[in-house]
């Protein structure tokens, strides 16, 4: 009983247009740009093969297992409108190919090898459908949106944050001072920048201590619960957990992690620690644009966002739609819903390729951050709704009178927008008017309005359908 050695087309084994997808399959939508002369079926089948059981030639050991049970299958290919050389290849992966509770393993399988494949000019993972059978093997966010609101006792409005700038170079004492001023002025949170870890000018332990002091002082004076995202990201998992432990000992409510540079294994480790110890977890997406910005190669951010919800985080940066960083409105709202909601219908107009049912996995608060200021407040309130965190770094610290008045201006603008919305006014149409009215009785807001009245970041978004 020999076996038929040699090389055969992938599509003979891995292109199965008659396949009915199972409820337990992980489904992927790839944007495939094959090399000239490679038919789309072969390219799609090659992706399915190389990201599951296949290799470039038939091997004797194939006979020792059931390929039909374990192989990925390219089950549908559709052309991309307006792109002659591209196709969307849909691939179904049997659940048994993946280790339970490991985003790391999921990505190693699905995107680990196949992106360097010679038969393809480019490849982009546009979306993943995670079946409940797989998502139930993950803890997910340490707490989720409702528990966070209960812990912070803040309801019926977006939360306000501010990244402390200059991001590098402040001493711990001065850093803590800036934190105190912002929280005292009316913000809910302040934030370590993503690259503030533990550098010579400010070691992590000193920063944690001075920030904790600032939090307690601001809480005592305002009667509100305050937080500062203490960045626990470090060079090793052990060091990261050590920092999280210290944050817990200080009694602060929230820590932070850079999940892409830190890696999914570290992130899931930290998320488990945070749930076990009552810490909220803020996630920064530093490095995401390296992966998601090219239209025809890499991975769309909605995939990274889904992966984060599985790995665990209570907040994640998700673009602004209006500020200085990337984000097209409908597409952004698509993955914002994927982060917050339990059940999201397939909607290609928003870039959502599959219906996603998260069952009981807690939701994540999207964070809008980057180049936003008081004039954006009505748009942000309208676009993101209550379940979001609006972060004004320069838009707080750049206030001509200083940090605390900058915080006051943002809080007044937010409360004015929320009140106007609750009274039934149209934020999209009357936004500027609402801000102007509020600035009449808030000199801090009036000063902020004056400084930023002309600022715009008008560039075409790259992230289009």
Swiss-Prot record:
Which residues are annotated as active site? 165, 284
User: Site described as Transition state stabilizer, positions?
Assistant: 324
Q: Which domain of life is it from?
A: Eukaryota
Organism the protein comes from: Hamamelis mollis (Chinese witch hazel)
What are its GO biological-process terms?
photorespiration; reductive pentose-phosphate cycle
Chain positions recorded as Mg(2+) binding sites: 191, 193-194
A single MF term (Gene Ontology):
ribulose-bisphosphate carboxylase activity
| Gene name as annotated | rbcL
Q: Protein name, please?
A: Ribulose bisphosphate carboxylase large chain
């Amino acid at each position: 009983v020999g076996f038929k050695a040699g090389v055969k087309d992938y599509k003979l084994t891995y292109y199965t247009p008659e396949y009915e997808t199972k409820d337990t399959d992980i489904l992927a939508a790839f944007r495939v740009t094959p090399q000239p002369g490679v038919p789309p079926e072969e390219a799609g089948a090659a992706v399915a093969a190389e990201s599951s059981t296949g290799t470039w030639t038939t091997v004797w050991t194939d006979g020792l297992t059931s390929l039909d049970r374990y192989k990925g299958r390219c089950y549908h290919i559709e052309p991309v409108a307006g792109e002659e050389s591209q196709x969307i290849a849909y691939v179904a992966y049997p659940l048994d190919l993946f280790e339970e509770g490991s985003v790391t393993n999921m990505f190693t399988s699905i995107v680990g090898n196949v992106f360097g494949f010679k038969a393809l000019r480019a490849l982009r993972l546009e979306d993943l459908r995670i079946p409940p059978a797989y998502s139930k093997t993950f803890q997910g966010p340490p707490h989720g949106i409702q528990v966070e609101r209960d812990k912070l006792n803040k309801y019926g409005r977006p939360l306000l944050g501010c990244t402390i700038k200059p991001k590098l170079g402040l001493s711990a004492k001065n850093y803590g001072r800036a934190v105190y001023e912002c929280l005292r002025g009316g913000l809910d949170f302040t934030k370590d920048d993503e690259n503030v870890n533990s550098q010579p000018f400010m070691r992590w332990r000193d920063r944690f201590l001075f920030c904790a002091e600032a939090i307690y002082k601001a809480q005592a004076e305002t009667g509100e619960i305050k937080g500062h995202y203490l960045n626990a990201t470090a060079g090793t998992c052990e060091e990261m957990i050590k920092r999280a432990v210290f944050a817990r000992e200080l009694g602060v409510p929230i820590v932070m992690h850079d999940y892409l540079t830190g890696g999914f294994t570290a992130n899931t480790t930290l998320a488990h620690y945070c749930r076990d110890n009552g810490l909220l977890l803020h996630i920064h997406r530093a490095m995401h644009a390296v992966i998601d910005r090219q239209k025809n190669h890499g991975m769309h951010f909605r995939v990274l966002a889904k992966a984060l919800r599985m790995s665990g985080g209570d907040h994640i940066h998700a673009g602004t739609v209006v500020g200085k960083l990337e984000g097209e409105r409908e597409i952004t709202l698509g993955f914002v819903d994927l982060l917050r909601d339990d059940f999201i219908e397939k909607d290609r107009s928003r870039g959502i390729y599959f219906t996603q049912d998260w069952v009981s996995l807690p939701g994540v608060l999207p964070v809008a951050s980057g180049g936003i200021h008081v004039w954006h407040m009505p748009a942000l309130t309208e676009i993101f709704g209550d379940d979001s965190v609006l972060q004004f770094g320069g838009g707080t610290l750049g206030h001509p009178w200083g940090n605390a008045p900058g915080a006051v201006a943002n809080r007044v603008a937010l409360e004015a927008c929320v009140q106007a919305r609750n009274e039934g006014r149209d934020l999209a149409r009357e936004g500027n008017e609402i801000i102007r009215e509020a600035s009449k009785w808030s000199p801090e807001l009036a000063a902020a309005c004056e400084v930023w009245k002309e600022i715009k970041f008008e560039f075409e978004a790259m992230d289009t359908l």
